[in-house]
Amino acid sequence: MTDAALAPAPVVRGTAHATRRAMSRNVLATAALVMLVLAVLLALAAPWLPLADPDTVNTPARLQPPLTPGYPLGTDEFGRDLLSRLVWGARVSLLAGVGTAGLAMVVGVTLGIVGGYYTGWIEILVMRLTDILMAFPYILLAIAIVAGLGPGLRNAMIAIAIVGFPFYTRLVRSVVLSIREREFVEAARALGSPDPVILRRHVLPHLLSPVIVAFSLDVGAKILATAGLSFLGLGTQPPTADWGSMLATGRQFVVLRPHVVLLPGLAIFLMVLSLNLVGDAVRDFLDPRTTS
C-alpha cells in the first residue's frame, strides 16, 4: 500500500493573482463583478445612506417622474421614493437569493453525499424523493408550498429551497458515485477509517469546485424566483420594499408612468445578469475544460 494511494483528494486552490488575471481576460465578467459589488455595498449601507424612508407615504407627490427635485428616480403610486425603495429592495433580494440558495445547497449536498456514498434503501429513498420533486414544474410547486405555508418572505424562501435542493442532490451524488470506489477511498476503508473521516478527507474536497460553481449560478435564479413569488403576492408583503412587489403594484401605471415598472424590472435584470456572468467566470476559472 503506497502513501500516494492514501493521499487525500486534492483541493482546488486558486491564488488571488490568478483570479484577478482570469477576471481581467473577461471584460463582461469584470464589469458584472463591479456592478455586483456596488449593489452589495449599497444594500449593506442602506441604513446609513441619506435616503428617504422607503415606506413613508406622500400622497401629494405620487407618481412623480425621475429627476423631480427631492426624488431622483421619481415616486410610486403612494408617493414613496423609488430610489430608496430600490436600494432597500436590494437588501431583500440579496438576502432571499443567497439565503435560499444556501439553504438549498446545504440540504442538497447532504442528501447527495448520503445518497451517493451509501447503497441500498438509503440511496433509493434519497433518489425517489429527488425524482418526485423534480417531476413537478419548479415555480408551480413553489406556489403550492407557499399556499400551504402562508404568504411571506420566509415561507417563500423555504418553498424555493425545497424545490431547489434536488439540483444539488443530483450534482453531488454524481460526483460521489464517481469517486466512492476509487483506490484512495478503498484503501482508507480497508485501514478502518470511519465513514465521516473518509467523507471529510477524500470526498468533500472533490465537491468544492462543482458546488461553488453551482451556487454562484443558482443565486441569480433564486432572486428571480423570489421576485416572481412577490409579484404574485406570495413573497414579501407590503409595505416592505421588494423588487417583485414593486413590479406588481406598478404594472397598472405602466402607460402613465412607465418608470414605476421599468426601474425595478431593470434592477432585477441587471442583478441576475451580473450574477450569471460572474458565475460563468467562476466556472471557467475552476474548470477550464468548460471554456469554449
Feature map (PLM): residue ranges:
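Gly/Trp-centered helix-boundary motif
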Residues: M1-V109, I113-V114, G120-W121, R128, ...
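Transmembrane helix-loop junction
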Residues: A43, P47, I113-Y117, V146-G148, ...
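Generic hydrophobic transmembrane alpha-helix motif, especially the helices
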Residues: P72, D76, L82, V106, ...
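Helix-loop-helix units of permease transmembrane domains in multi-pass membrane transporters
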Residues: R85, F184-L191, L199
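Short alpha-helical transmembrane interface motifs in multi-pass membrane proteins
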Residues: V92-A96, L111, E123-M127, R154-I158, ...
